[in-house]
Amino acid sequence: MNKWLNTLSKTFTFRLLNCHYRRSLPLCQNFSLKKSLTHNQVRFFKMSDLDNLPPVDPKTGEVIINPLKEDGSPKTPKEIEKEKKKAEKLLKFAAKQAKKNAAATTGASQKKPKKKKEVEPIPEFIDKTVPGEKKILVSLDDPALKAYNPANVESSWYDWWIKTGVFEPEFTADGKVKPEGVFCIPAPPPNVTGALHIGHALTIAIQDSLIRYNRMKGKTVLFLPGFDHAGIATQSVVEKQIWAKDRKTRHDYGREAFVGKVWEWKEEYHSRIKNQIQKLGASYDWSREAFTLSPELTKSVEEAFVRLHDEGVIYRASRLVNWSVKLNTAISNLEVENKDVKSRTLLSVPGYDEKVEFGVLTSFAYPVIGSDEKLIIATTRPETIFGDTAVAVHPDDDRYKHLHGKFIQHPFLPRKIPIITDKEAVDMEFGTGAVKITPAHDQNDYNTGKRHNLEFINILTDDGLLNEECGPEWQGMKRFDARKKVIEQLKEKNLYVGQEDNEMTIPTCSRSGDIIEPLLKPQWWVSQSEMAKDAIKVVRDGQITITPKSSEAEYFHWLGNIQDWCISRQLWWGHRCPVYFINIEGEEHDRIDGDYWVAGRSMEEAEKKAAAKYPNSKFTLEQDEDVLDTWFSSGLWPFSTLGWPEKTKDMETFYPFSMLETGWDILFFWVTRMILLGLKLTGSVPFKEVFCHSLVRDAQGRKMSKSLGNVIDPLDVITGIKLDDLHAKLLQGNLDPREVEKAKIGQKESYPNGIPQCGTDAMRFALCAYTTGGRDINLDILRVEGYRKFCNKIYQATKFALMRLGDDYQPPATEGLSGNESLVEKWILHKLTETSKIVNEALDKRDFLTSTSSIYEFWYLICDVYIENSKYLIQEGSAIEKKSAKDTLYILLDNALKLIHPFMPFISEEMWQRLPKRSTEKAASIVKASYPVYVSEYDDVKSANAYDLVLNITKEARSLLSEYNILKNGKVFVESNHEEYFKTAEDQKDSIVSLIKAIDEVTVVRDASEIPEGCVLQSVNPEVNVHLLVKGHVDIDAEIAKVQKKLEKAKKSKNGIEQTINSKDYETKANTQAKEANKSKLDNTVAEIEGLEATIENLKRLKL
C-alpha cells in the first residue's frame, strides 16, 4: 500500500466534495494521490470515483477502516482485514485508471507542451512604520502585497500593542475588576540558558489563545511573564563556555567574578529569549515582568525559607543525595534520568577517555576470620568495597546460621567486617543469599545501616576520586578506574569468582550525562509528608482541577509516595541559603547539627536569633555557601510575582490565578511544589485549574534531541531556514564534534529541504490544532506549512471582499438582521452563530481541536460558498439585495477575524484594521474587540436546511459533470414534486449556477416526464433528483454499462441494509440513532435504484 503512495509526486491535491458543500480540507485530512500523474491528468480522476474511495492516513499511507458495522456493533478482525484488502485494491485500481485515462487522451497535448507562464517576482515590502506607532497600512494593490507574506503581515503590530498598553489588565473606572470577571495565567518562566524550543511555542500558543479569548470576552486579564535563573542549567552552560573559550574553570575566577560572568550571560540571553517570545505574539503584561533572582523575588525566597525553617519544615540532615561528580552538586530525584540496560553495556562517562562497562554482576569472596570458609557475595559496583561495613544474611537461612555473629576480613584494608542478620535486606532465593552492606553509598544499605547502627564510611571525594578511607594505594584514583583495579587484585588474591550479565537501571544526571553517585552529605531538606496531605485534599475537593485525568492520577500517586525534598545545591549561581552557622568561641561543633544554625532575612536578624539561643556565649556567624534548588524559588512563582509577602493589590486581585497551563512532564518538578508551598505559605491554592498539554515530538514520534538533529527553533518555522543554515546552527551550541555529525544526518532526514517559511500565525494555529489531550504531539512541518496556505486563504478572501465592498462602504451602526437577507445569507449567518457557540464552548472546555477545526471550517464556508454565491447578488442584484449582501459579507469578515484572533493574532489584526468600522465600535485594536457569541436571531435552522439542499444539489450536479467529463455548457435539471424542495430549488437557481462553473443554467421540474431524453440521474434524497443531459457527449453503450454497475452496487447495498434491519435482535439491540441512520440510508438507496433504472431506460431510448 505504502509503495505506490510513497512514489507519488506532490503535483496536486484533490479538492473533495463534502456532503454539504465544496471545500478544501485541512492538510491533515487531504487525500493526496502522489503517483506519477501530471497536473493535466487530474481531471481524469472522476469525482464519483473519489466519492467511493476509502479514506487514507496521510502519514502512514494505511487505509482507515471503520471498526463498527452499520448497526453500531463491532466488526470482527477477519471482517476488518477483508474490508482493508478490498479497499487497497480499489485504491490501486483507481490510480491506474486515472493514469490510463490520462495517457489515452493527453497524448496530443504532451507533444506540444505549453510554455511555462513567467511569474513576476514580488518586490520586497518595506515597512516604514516607526516602532511603537500604529502600522502604516499600505494599499493591498501595492505589488509587494499581491501575495500573502507572513513577514509583511506580522511586522509592527507587537510594538504598537505594547506601547498602547492593550496587554495590561483593564479595570473599571474605580479600579475594580470588570463585571465580566478576572482571568489570569502565570507564564511558566523559561530558563535563561539559550533559546526557546518548539515546546515553549506550544505553551505560549495555548496560553495566549486563552488569554486573548478571555480578554475579548471583556474580563480583567493578566498574563504575567518572567524568567527563571535556572541554577544548575545556567551555571553548567556558562562553565562549558568559559572552558571552551578561555580554558578556565569557575574556581579560576572565584565566586564573585564567576557569578558576574553568569549575569553577563543572563543579560544577553534574556533579551534574546524575550525577543523570541514577542515574535510568537504572546500578549504578556511586560510591565510586570519578573525574574527569580531579582531583589523583589529574592526577598520572597528568603521569607519563605525563614518561615519554613522556624517552623521546622526545613531542617538539616546528613543523608544520601544524588551527587553529580561533573557538576559537583547534589541534584533532585526529578533531575535523575534512569537508563535501563539488559546486559553488558559500554557507556560514555564525562571525565573518562574510554567507555565504562555496566550491566555486569561481579561475584567475589570474603574470607571468614577464624576458618577456611569464604562468603561469596555479588555486586554491580566493585569499587564500593572500601565502604563495606557489614555482610548481611537472612536469619532463617540454614546455610549461614553457623556464621551469625562472626567476622570477615576486608581484602584490601585492616578492617574486620561483621556478619549480620536482616530479613529486610536479604532475599534468600536471590544470588548467594549474602549481601554486602555499604551504608554511605546505597539507599537500601543506608536504611540497613541505620537499623543496625553500622559505621557510615564515605569513600569518595566530591570529584569522584577515592579518598583517604581507601588507603594510600587507592587514594586519588578515579572511581571507575578503581573498579577495574579492584577486580584485578581480587583475581590476584584468588577471591574473584566470576561475572555475568545483569539487567539493571543506571541513574544519570539529566544536565551533564554523568553517572550519579549516592553520597552522604549534610543538606537542607523540606519535610513534605504533611503538606502533601493538604495538596491531595484540595484536588479531591475540587478546589483545583487537573486536566487530563491521567495527569490527576499521576499527581495523587506521586504525592501519596512523596519523600522529603533536598533543597541545597553546591553551586554559586542561585539564591544563597539564608541560614547561618554559629561558631561559638572555644567550642567545636558539627555542621550537621541543626542546633547550631539559624535562619535570617538578614545578618542582623540571624545575630539576634543566635544571641537568644546562646545568650552567654561569644560567637561569629558564617552564612552557608550552598544555594537553593531552582525549583524552590519556582515553587513560589504564583505569589512571589504578585508581591508576596506584602499584601499588594495584585495579590488581592489575581491570587489565586485562574489556571496554570504547562507540559505534563513538569507536573512534579514544578506544579505540585507550587501547590505545596502555596497552601503552606498563603493558606490558599495558587491556581484553580491545571491544564497539562502534550509533549512535542518529531514527525516520526521521536523525542526532540540536539544530538538527533530534530530540535525545532520556533523562529526557524516562522522565518524559514535552509538545510545548510540548520547545519551551521549546530556549531553554535555545546555539542561534542562527534554529536554534530550525527545531528547533521538527523537534520537531513527530518528536513531535507530545510524548513519553509510558515509565519507565527500558521505555527500557533497548527500547535493548537494538534492539542487533543494526548500525551504526545508528532509535529509535521508540512502540516504547519498547510496552515500557512490557510492564512493565504484568509488574506486573499479579505482582500477580495474589501474590493467587493468598495471604498465608500460604511457598515450599519449595529449588527443584526435587516429582513432583506437572501437564503444564502440566512444560511451563512446561521453557520456564524453556530460556529461562535461551538468555539466559545470549546475554549471554555480547553478543547483546542474543536475550536480550531470549527473556525477553519467556517472560513472555508465564507470563501468557497458565500463569497462565490454573493458575487451575483453584489453585481447583478437590486440595490436592496446588494446592500444586504454587502452587510452580511461585512458581518462575516468582522466576526471571522475576531473568531480566529486568539490563534492568529497578526493576520487578524492586519485585516481587521483594513475593514471599515461601525460608528459604535470602541476598540482601537482587535485585541480589545468583543469576541463573537451565539446570536439567537441568526439561528435559522429552516433556512439553513433549505440552503443545505441547494449545496447537496450542487454537489451531485458537479459529480455528474465530472463523471461525464462535461467541462462547459452543461445542462442540469432538478426534479422534485415536494412543494418545499421544488420552491427552494426554483428560487435558488442563480445560486446553483454561481456555484457550478460548467453550466449556464438550471431547470427545475416537478415530474420526471419533463426531463428530456438523453439524461443521467443522481439522487440527492428520496424527494429530489439531479439530471444531466449527456446526449451527444458520451458513448451510450458504455454509459449504460456504467449505470448498470451502479445499479448492481446500489441493489447490493439495499440488500445489506435490509439484512441488517431484519436480523435477529435488531429491534432490541440496535440503538435509536443506528435505526434512524439505517432507515434514512435505505430510503436514499431505494430512491437511487429507482433513478438509476429510469436512467438506463432513458439511455436505451437514445439508441432507438
Curated annotation (Swiss-Prot):
Pfam family, any one: Anticodon_1
Transcription regulation is among the record's keywords: no
Keyword Mitochondrion belongs to the record: yes
Catalytic activity: tRNA(Val) + L-valine + ATP = L-valyl-tRNA(Val) + AMP + diphosphate
Binding site for ATP: K706
Presequence range in chain numbering: 1-47
GO biological process: valyl-tRNA aminoacylation
Enzyme class: ligase
Renumbered ranges of motif 'KMSKS' region: 703-707
Motif 'HIGH' region, residue numbers: 190-200
UniProt keyword list: Aminoacyl-tRNA synthetase, ATP-binding, Cytoplasm, Ligase, Mitochondrion, Nucleotide-binding, Phosphoprotein, Protein biosynthesis, Transit peptide
Modified residues (Phosphoserine): S73, S294, S332, S707
Note: Present with 358 molecules/cell in log phase SD medium.
HAMAP family in alphabetical order: Val_tRNA_synth_type1
Similarity comment: family membership: Belongs to the class-I aminoacyl-tRNA synthetase family.
The protein, known as: Valine--tRNA ligase, mitochondrial
Taxonomic source organism: Saccharomyces cerevisiae (strain ATCC 204508 / S288c) (Baker's yeast)
Name of the gene this protein is made from: VAS1
